[in-house]
Structures are given as structure tokens and as C-alpha cells.
Regions:
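A short helix-loop-beta-strand connector motif used in the catalytic cores of GNAT acetyltransferases and
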Residues: 44-55
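A short beta-loop-alpha structural element at the N-terminal edge
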Residues: 4-16
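A conserved beta-turn-beta hairpin within the catalytic core of GNAT-like acetyltransferases
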Residues: 71-82
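Conserved GNAT-fold acetyl-CoA-binding loop/helix
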Residues: 17-42
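Conserved beta-strand in the GNAT
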Residues: 55, 61-69
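A short, internal acetyl-CoA/4′-phosphopantetheine-binding micro-motif in the GNAT/acyltransferase core
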Residues: 85-88
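A cytosolic small-molecule/anion-sensing beta-strand core signal
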Residues: 58, 83
Length: 88
């Protein structure tokens, strides 16, 4: 199976939200996902973006994602925080 990694684009947000819901179900907390597709689109398009997302694809099928965001540490400076890494 060939797997490719790419930056998520607006057209990927419905599939991303489905994967987020799958992850929440796996963690036995499906009711905790309050996020909407509209919120994902808005926050991804913010300047600067509220998060960054890479998706793993095999053909047209999205197999997983890595969602991250930048933060700042008074001890270390700029950091990248990986919020979730999920692969089916």
C-alpha cells in the first residue's frame, strides 16, 4: 500500500472531522467532540492558522491525521505541540 502525507486543505475538513470523531470513540468519549466543520474551516484559515494538519492518504482514502499547533515557552521559546496523531 502506498501512503502519501500532505497538508490538509479545506476540502479535507469533512473527512478530518470524521477521523476526529473516530478517535474520540476509540477513547470512549464521542460526546466530547463539539467541533464543527465550519469551526475547522474558520480556524484553519485564520491568520495565523489556529492549527496545522497533515493527512495520510492511500489513493483517495484518508487513513489518518496529525493535528498540531505552535505555542511559546518562556524556557524554550517556540514549540510545536502535537495535539493528536491518529491512523485507522
Amino acid at each position: 500500500m502506498d501512503v502519501h502525507i500532505k497538508k490538509a486543505i479545506p476540502a479535507d475538513m469533512p473527512a478530518l472531522l470524521n477521523l476526529i470523531r473516530e478517535l474520540a470513540s476509540y477513547e470512549q468519549a464521542p460526546e466530547k467532540v463539539l467541533l464543527s466543520e465550519e469551526t475547522l474551516l474558520r480556524d484553519a484559515a485564520a491568520d495565523p492558522p489556529c492549527f496545522h494538519c497533515l493527512i495520510a492518504l492511500s489513493g483517495e482514502e484518508i487513513l489518518g491525521f496529525c493535528l498540531s499547533w505552535f505555542r511559546y515557552s518562556t524556557w524554550r521559546g517556540r514549540l510545536l505541540y502535537v495535539e493528536d496523531l491518529y491512523v485507522r
